[in-house]
């Protein structure tokens, strides 16, 4: 609002003795602080006096719109006053206040008139107006419109109404009973909803203020529809083509009829008209809402024209309808694929069939017409085939090139027949052409030569390898059999050495190969197929024998002479590195199996000597000291590098002397300085003594039990048969002969075995000697007599390799009392070649292997080759035994005697062999030469030689552990 200025109109002032009344006027919405009038002047009272007289300004209104400014005495506006809020629906708006003054008391009434201003525009309380007028009304129809309201009074109120221009409506004013007016809408022209469904008008109300204010209301006139229009199709005739194979549900048309009416008057439903023939009504289906015409049944043969009528009707109260014509032309489609009919088919086809050979003959046909029935045939194949047209709709499949079953054994021929329709239809047929085999391929080996390797000492039947020839032919034409062909010009034939399995080609050995005798040979194997005629090929087999470590090193130098230890003399003044001797050895094996190294395994003084590991030179490792013993003993082991390694040893005696003695001393007792046993040997002697005493106790108990059960038996009736598992021979043993036995065995070098077993019965004059071997009767008789056995003739039996038995008369003979072990014999018994980590002993080169006995401290039960020495040999039989460890000794050649054995009264050496671990020969026997009386005599000498026997026991134990 615009401020009017401060205009105070004093209408009148009524002064009385006690009260007065003042009136003021102010326009509404006057701003704060504006002076309405000067109370001080109107009351004729100074402004300062008002304050001194306790001036008070009272009002009955909640809000104080006016107040008194004491310094100036003016009546001012505190809050703008809105007349429409303070005095709604009142012609005059007056605010009354009370002014109280004291001393003297005075009361004044103040009336303030709030004057109206044109600050409000006309307003339609209902807002926009919406009228529904049916289109069928005639002009002149009247429709009341709402009044507008204006809060202002007097000329600021509403004075007039106006309507926006329209060709269908005009505005008119109606009057009420109270004289008030209201606007009316009058229809000037008939309405058509299909042309214009909605009319928008603006009703405006204006007041009389300065400046004038106005308010608008939008009048929306909606024309209400009536069913005055029938549906109209887009086209009067619908024409289409449909294939004869159209399935049910195929949409032929989508017709549409338009109805400009609204609502249900304009909703159209479709159906077949009654004008359609009854026989066609079941072939079509019309959707009532969408107007789709679908196929409901078969339309009949091609080239048929079907005519039907469709009706569109609205849903008004009085439904209006219209019709359209449907023309459906049934057309032919390519709905038949070509058919193939095979008249002949040759399968399989031989791979040598000539080009031009007919494989198949077939015909094609198509039930469709015109281009849909024209058929074109084609072929797709990677093979040598050709498709040709014989005559109308007949085709032949021919061979167009060579066939090879080994490259391709089967062909897949794809024949395609296509018509000329749109789209074309085709039929495919795959023919499998198998190629029959003919024998046109020769067996072939992967290589013309093949190398095979076999380790020596193989067993007969060992697999050497396998040959394999490939033949791509089929069946018997590709079945290869193998045959051995001899091509060895010298030596044994290949057929005597190897065999070839005809079906698998496996090559096996017929014999055991020895690398040292046969290092390799070659032969041929022929592979032949089973075709007609057969084809064959050969392969050369080069067989190599691989060496095994089966030969022990053989010491060539130094060699024991006369069964004594070889002795070397070293001056005491020898310097360090003095050459004592050189050990020379050889090995029949090859490669690393023959690579020898030399080591000192034992020495009387290990610090005095050293040996070259490669060349075997034994040298002094330091200067000879005066305290060094004169007699030194060194055991040199020669070991190869096989897997496992084999070794041999030689015992050397070294005499530390500046002069050459006339008689060499005995080195048998030289092992430890000062003649003392090492702690290890001492433990071994104690263990052997305990075991020996335990064994003797068990043996005595067993003998007593046997004597108690069998007081006597004859030599022949008490014999029983046992089996020698190693050699497969039977021998006869007498259970009564448990007191003493001697077993002397030489293991075969190739296949010969010699076993001598003698048994002497306890407490009986009838003794038996059971020997096995290939000796004549005289030799066996001499042997039995020589060993001092008193045997009856009836108990001497001989069994040769053929299994024949014979009895030999044996004359008893006493042993030679002069036969003793000499010092050289004892020394020779300690010079041996042994297998590493075993107790098998061998002789020097060129001679058969031997197993030398060692001396133990007691006479335990013999185990695996332990035997007692002969009585009268110079050693008490109850104090030591010959003993050697287990092993696999080499075997003697056929016809060979045991290497060495002792005959009483002769310097020869007995070679005592170990029986195999699994041998069933009774191991509980031990050797006693002579009679019991001689044994008793020897026992008397035991006490006198007690000190010497202990020394021999210690040396024997030391030798045994070394061996």
Curated annotation (Swiss-Prot):
Location in or out of the cell: Cell membrane
Name of the protein this chain belongs to: Protocadherin alpha-C1
BP GO terms, sorted: cell adhesion; homophilic cell adhesion via plasma membrane adhesion molecules; nervous system development
Residues modified by glycosylation: 38, 248, 274, 562
Disulfide bridges in this chain: none
Gene: PCDHAC1
A single Gene Ontology CC term: plasma membrane
Composition bias type Basic and acidic residues, residue spans: 922-936
Region (4 X 4 AA repeats of P-X-X-P): 812-907
Principal place of residence: membrane
GO molecular function, one term: calcium ion binding
């Amino acid at each position: 609002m615009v401020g009017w200025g401060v205009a105070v109109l004093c209408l009148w002032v009524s002064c009385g003795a006690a009260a007065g009344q003042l009136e003021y006027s102010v326009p509404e919405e006057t701003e704060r602080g504006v002076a309405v009038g000067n109370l001080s002047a109107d009351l004729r009272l100074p402004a300062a006096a008002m304050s001194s007289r306790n001036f008070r300004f009272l009002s009955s209104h909640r809000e104080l719109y006016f107040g008194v400014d004491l310094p100036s005495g003016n009546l001012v506006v505190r809050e703008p006053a809105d007349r429409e809020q303070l005095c709604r629906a009142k012609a005059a708006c007056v605010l009354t206040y009370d002014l109280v003054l004291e001393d003297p008391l005075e009361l004044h009434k103040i009336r303030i008139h709030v004057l109206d201003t044109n600050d409000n525009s006309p307003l339609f309380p209902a807002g926009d107006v919406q009228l529904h007028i049916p289109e069928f009304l005639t002009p002149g129809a009247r429709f009341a419109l709402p009044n507008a309201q204006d809060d202002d009074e007097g000329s600021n109120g509403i004075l007039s109404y106006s309507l926006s221009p329209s060709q269908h409506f005009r505005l008119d004013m109606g009057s009420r009973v109270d004289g008030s007016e209201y606007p009316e809408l009058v229809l000037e022209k008939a309405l058509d909803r299909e042309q214009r469904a909605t009319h928008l008008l603006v009703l405006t109300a204006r007041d009389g203020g300065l400046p004038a204010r106005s308010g608008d209301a939008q009048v929306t006139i909606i024309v209400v529809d009536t069913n005055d229009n029938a549906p109209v199709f887009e086209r009067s005739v619908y024409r289409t083509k449909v294939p004869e194979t159209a399935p049910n549900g195929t949409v032929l048309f989508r017709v549409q009829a338009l109805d400009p009416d609204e609502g249900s008057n304009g909703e159209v439903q479709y159906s077949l008209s009654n004008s359609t023939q009854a026989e066609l009504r079941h072939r079509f289906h019309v959707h009532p809402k969408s107007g789709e015409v679908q196929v409901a049944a078969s339309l009949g043969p091609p080239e048929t024209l079907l005519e039907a009528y469709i009706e569109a009707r609205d849903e008004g109260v009085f439904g209006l309808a219209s019709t359209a014509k449907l023309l459906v032309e049934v057309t032919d489609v390519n709905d038949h694929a070509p058919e193939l009919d095979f008249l002949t088919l040759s399968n399989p086809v031989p791979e040598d069939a000539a080009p031009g050979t007919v494989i198949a003959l077939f015909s094609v046909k198509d039930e469709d017409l015109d281009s849909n029935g024209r058929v074109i045939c084609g072929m797709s194949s990677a093979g040598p085939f050709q498709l040709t047209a014989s005559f109308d709709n007949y085709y032949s499949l021919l061979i167009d090139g060579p066939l090879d079953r080994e490259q391709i054994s089967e062909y897949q021929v794809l024949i395609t027949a296509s018509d000329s329709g749109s789209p074309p239809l085709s039929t495919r047929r795959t023919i499998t052409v198998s190629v029959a085999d003919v024998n046109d391929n020769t067996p072939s080996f992967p290589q013309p030569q093949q190398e095979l390797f076999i380790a020596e000492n193989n067993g007969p039947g060992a697999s050497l390898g396998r040959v394999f020839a490939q033949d791509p032919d089929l069946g018997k034409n590709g079945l290869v059999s193998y045959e051995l062909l001899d091509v060895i010009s010298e030596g044994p034939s290949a057929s005597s050495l190897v065999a070839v399995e005809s079906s698998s080609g496996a090559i096996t050995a017929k014999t055991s190969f020895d690398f040292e005798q046969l290092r390799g040979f070659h032969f041929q194997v022929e592979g032949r197929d089973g075709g007609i005629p057969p084809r064959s090929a050969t392969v050369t087999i080069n067989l190599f024998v691989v060496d095994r470590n089966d030969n022990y090193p053989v010491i060539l130098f130094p060699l024991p002479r006369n069964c004594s230890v070889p002795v070397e003399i070293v001056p005491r003044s020898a310097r360090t590195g003095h050459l004592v001797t050189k050990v020379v050895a050889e090995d029949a094996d090859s490669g690393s199996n023959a690579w020898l190294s030399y080591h000192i395994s034992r020495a009387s003084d290990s610090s005095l000597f050293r040996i070259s590991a490669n060349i075997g030179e034994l040298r002094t490792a330091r200067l000879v000291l005066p305290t060094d013993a004169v007699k030194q003993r060194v055991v040199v082991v020669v070991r190869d590098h096989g897997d496992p390694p084999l070794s041999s040893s030689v015992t050397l005696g070294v005499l530390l002397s500046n002069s050459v003695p006339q008689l060499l001393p005995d080195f048998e007792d030289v092992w430890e300085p000062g003649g003392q046993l090492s702690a290890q040997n001492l433990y071994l002697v104690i263990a052997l003594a305990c075991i020996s005493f335990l064994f003797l106790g068990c043996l005595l108990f067993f003998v007593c039990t046997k004597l108690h059960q069998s007081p006597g038996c004859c030599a022949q009736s008490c014999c029983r048969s046992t089996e020698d598992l190693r050699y497969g021979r039977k021998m006869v043993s007498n259970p009564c002969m448990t007191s003493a036995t001697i077993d002397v065995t030489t293991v075969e070098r190739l296949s010969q075995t010699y076993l001598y077993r003698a048994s002497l019965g306890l407490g009986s004059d009838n003794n038996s000697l059971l020997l096995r071997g290939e000796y004549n009767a005289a030799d066996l008789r001499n042997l039995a007599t020589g060993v001092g056995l008193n045997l009856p003739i009836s108990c001497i039996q001989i069994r040769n390799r053929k299994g024949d038995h014979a009895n030999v008369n044996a004359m008893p003979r006493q042993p030679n009392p002069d036969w003793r072990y000499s010092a050289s014999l004892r020394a020779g018994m300690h010079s041996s070649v042994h297998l590493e980590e075993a107790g098998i002993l061998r002789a020097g080169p060129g001679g058969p292997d031997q197993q030398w006995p060692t001396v133990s401290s007691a006479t335990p039960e013999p185990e695996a080759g332990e035997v007692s020495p002969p009585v009268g040999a110079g050693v008490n039989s109850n104090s030591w035994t010959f003993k050697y460890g287990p092993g696999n000794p080499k075997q003697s050649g056929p016809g060979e005697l045991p290497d060495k054995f002792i005959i009483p009264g002769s310097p020869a050496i007995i070679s005592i062999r170990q029986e195999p671990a699994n041998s069933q020969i009774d191991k509980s026997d031990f050797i006693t030469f002579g009679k019991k009386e001689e044994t008793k005599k020897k026992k008397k000498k035991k006490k006198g030689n007690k000190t010497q026997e202990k020394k021999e026991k210690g040396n024997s134990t030391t030798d045994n552990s070394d061996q």
